[in-house]
């Protein structure tokens, strides 16, 4: 009977959700809002959404941030809705079609921006559609409806935030501190594996896990930043630690790859040193102190460059880690580390995927419009709203089909649950605000527990039930209206699910190829003598792309190794002492243009032609390096890069 069990850790958030719903309900009726349902629905969604995503009680700041995004999305949607209505009030059908395109446009943008901010754009898309559909009988009331909707949503968000603060939300700071310690130990153990040069699959698993953990730590940093302004210093340090952690992974993996061709570079001194096992961050601290003494004794020239760079990055990591844990004032040494290179933002590789999402949302909304006009069903507008909601919110997630199924299950569960409230509970409690609040608190409490378990349909059931029960001012009980609303939700979700199934997303392979070509372009762009360009920090963006590649192609080790090799080539060439002269500078610009053409090529033939041109230019570039007497630190990584591109040219050019 575990399915009905209530764990202790789930109770606090369930009470928090119930409190948010009750507060929104009380305030909505107290201020005589026309539809307090919107305030209650907003409070429930803002509070429960982060809990469903986290699989438990969300950390401090998550609910506030989601509420902030909802306010932004609502205001953008309301303004867009007003503009569309004012411009096209004389052509109602065209007005609705433009709203469908607007919803698709917002979904397209939400597919390209950071996933944390995509919620606001998805909301902006279907908010405009809700306004246009709702004011169809009385278009002159549009400004009043937009203002009322914004007011009700702001009230719901404030109630959710108040409930969150009332029940002392969890701080993520202790989790961050523990992860910093554990991550440093894991970094040292990865370097041990790479120096031993053992089983490649074990090394692949180790660095893959570290990439995921570093990405997760970056997510924790975002949560900590949302939690309170007092963590501003810790946030700055964590941002630099992210780059240092990625540097440690890169240097470790390069140490492994170097031994494939030149194992003699790693001397017995370092092999014996890294044989000592470590279990805690304190062990790593002791080993790093000893390692710095060994390097001082052997000299920088006798130390492999990857080990020297790794030790330098690990030392800086340790220094910043202590600052994060104590949250003390940033000293001069730390400030020097934090004043690092500016991070580079890379263009999204998911443009084709975003266009698929645009068509899914637009076509599903147009299909809903045709269904509404053809049937003349009074709740066709409700079906359209659900179509827009499902497609706008589902498209940005890794598995839109499962999100649509979750909504279908939720709306089906909402029918009997809403029926119970509509026919029995609310008619018998509407005369008493206390009883009405208690009845909705019970609903919020039990669904809050299920939401934290990520039960299929729980989130959809919470929103759909609140949406169909009578929480208007004044309350009117028309069974046909209730049934229409409930069935409209179900039909809308089914239509959205149908469109998601019919409009297939085949962009995965294209996205993977674009990502790999972006790695190639980054490696080529590192060959420059421009001081400002050499100081740019590409590492976070490159590993963000690698993380996306790992999510798109789980278990595809050849792709991961190729991407990692390109990242290593980029880092090595970025620091290489390339001779400074106009001849090489002009050729660097030419190679960058060719690499950009490879990424932007529309057909396989063009892509192969430009890629072949890039390989030829790399051969010429190696000859130029010999003419200008470039040192081995330059010629060797360029030769390795050219060899890798020759070896994998089919994977990088074919669809």
Swiss-Prot record:
NCBIfam families: PRK10631.1. Residues 1-12, 59-68, 114-120, 173-369, 428-430, 480-481 are periplasmic. One of its GO terms (molecular function) is transmembrane transporter activity. InterPro entries: PHBA_efflux_AaeB/fusaric-R, PHBA_efflux_pump_AaeB. This is p-hydroxybenzoic acid efflux pump subunit AaeB. The lineage of its organism: Bacteria, Pseudomonadati, Pseudomonadota, Gammaproteobacteria, Enterobacterales. Its main location: membrane. Keywords: Cell inner membrane, Cell membrane, Membrane, Transmembrane, Transmembrane helix, Transport. It comes from Escherichia coli O157:H7. GO terms for biological process: carboxylic acid transport. Belongs to the aromatic acid exporter ArAE (TC 2.A.85) family. It comes from the Bacteria. The keyword Transport applies. One of its GO terms (cellular component) is plasma membrane. It is found in: Cell inner membrane.
